[in-house]
Curated annotation (Swiss-Prot):
Annotated ATP binding sites: G114, E115, F116, G117, S118, G119, K120, T121
GO MF entry, a single one: ATP binding
UniProt-recorded name of the protein: DNA repair and recombination protein RadA
SMART domains recorded: AAA
Disulfide bonds: none
Family per record: Belongs to the eukaryotic RecA-like protein family.
Record NCBIfam families: PRK04301.1, recomb_radA
Keywords: ATP-binding, DNA damage, DNA recombination, DNA-binding, Nucleotide-binding
Described purpose of this protein according to its UniProt entry: Involved in DNA repair and in homologous recombination. Binds and assemble on single-stranded DNA to form a nucleoprotein filament. Hydrolyzes ATP in a ssDNA-dependent manner and promotes DNA strand exchange between homologous DNA molecules.
Gene it is expressed from: radA
Matching InterPro entries: AAA+_ATPase (IPR003593), DNA_recomb/repair_Rad51_C (IPR013632), DNA_recomb/repair_RadA (IPR011938), DNA_recomb/repair_RecA-like (IPR016467), DNA_repair_Rad51/TF_NusA_a-hlx (IPR010995), P-loop_NTPase (IPR027417), RecA_ATP-bd (IPR020588), RecA_monomer-monomer_interface (IPR020587)
């Protein structure tokens, strides 16, 4: 039994499946079987034909993929036990942590959406620092990967936040790996490479994409490009969610908003990305400007958390509770 559990943990990608060498891997990839999920739902005949392998080998590969993904019915008690091991990263504000059920969760995607200057990037910077704190201080003693699509990542801000927490700024910077994504294809390619990077360094506990939609929105404008954009965005988001689930890490994505001219009452802004982005993130939080350095966070959607609003502040030292 222990050997089966260990084998399940070892299988992370298609190339980890027994009997899948480089030649078979190349054939599977060319035929569209590049993920464990695609293999798990394939028929033995299709897989055998695509990779040029015997039916019995295809059956074994499919079974291994299904076992690795733990595709089976589970009791509610098993699911509760799995949920109990989910970890949280503090945001720096007790009020915001409370809204999130204790902080930014691992094994899921948290979306922060709001207008320009609302504080989304500030939260991303803060959590990239806080993930490095020990568990007793609200962190995971881990590292962060930061995908910057808008050129807003600032080391000066990271150092100020680190110093405020009594951390060595240079060490904190060393534990944050950042890359500037220059367009949609580059952004997608970066995420596709993340699995290899994270598999080699299990101390990575946070992935940030700031922002998830800016390149998609700029490059796929117009109704005629909407279907292609949504398909690419959907696949991109699911790759990130899969990383969160496999490697027990937190994923934060930020998103822009746009005005709806048909709204005559209430908040006229909605998140960019349509239904694709409404359904994929496990937790969706809207960030709004308030007076001065205060911001309002509103829980929009989470299956296990109630709707609500809290106020927090963006200070010189980082994200903090709002002073009364």
């Amino acid at each position: 039994m222990a050997d089966q559990v260990e084998e399940k943990k070892r299988i992370k990608t298609v190339k980890d499946l027994s009997g899948v060498g480089q030649a078979v891997l190349n054939k599977l990839t060319e035929a569209g079987y590049s993920t464990l999920e695609s293999i798990a739902v394939a028929s033995p005949q299709d897989l055998s034909t695509a990779a040029g392998i015997p039916i019995t080998t295809a059956q074994r590969i499919i079974k291994e993929a299904r076992d690795a993904l733990d595709i089976r019915f589970k009791t509610a008690l098993e699911i509760e036990q799995e949920r109990a091991s989910v970890k949280k990263i503090t945001t720096g504000s007790q009020a915001l942590d409370g809204l999130l059920g204790g902080g930014i969760e691992t094994r899921t995607m948290t979306e922060l959406f709001g207008e320009f200057g609302s504080g989304k990037t500030q939260i991303c910077h803060q959590v990239s620092v806080n993930v490095q704190l020990p568990p007793e201080r609200g962190g995971l003693s881990g590292k962060a990967l930061y995908i910057d699509t808008e050129g807003t990542f600032r080391t000066e801000r990271i150092k100020a936040m680190a110093s405020a927490l009594g951390l060595e700024p240079k060490e904190v910077l060393q534990n944050i790996m950042s890359i500037r994504a220059i367009n949609t294809d580059h952004q997608i390619a970066i995420v596709e490479e993340l699995q290899d990077i994270i598999a080699k360094d299990n101390s990575i506990k946070l992935v940030v994409v700031d922002s998830i939609t800016s390149h998609f929105r700029a490059e796929y404008s117009g109704r005629e490009n909407l279907a292609v954009r949504q398909q690419k965005l959907n696949r991109h988001l699911h790759q990130l969610v899969r990383l969160a689930e496999i490697y027990d890490l937190a994923v934060i994505v930020t998103n822009q908003v746009m005005a709806r001219p048909d709204m005559f009452y209430g908040d006229p802004t909605v998140a960019v990305g349509g239904h694709t982005l409404y359904h994929v993130p496990g937790i969706r939080v809207q960030i709004k400007k308030s007076r001065g350095n205060r911001r309002i966070a509103r829980m929009v959607d989470a299956p296990h958390l109630p709707e609500g609003e809290v106020v927090f502040s963006i200070t010189n030292t980082g994200i903090r509770d709002a002073e009364e």
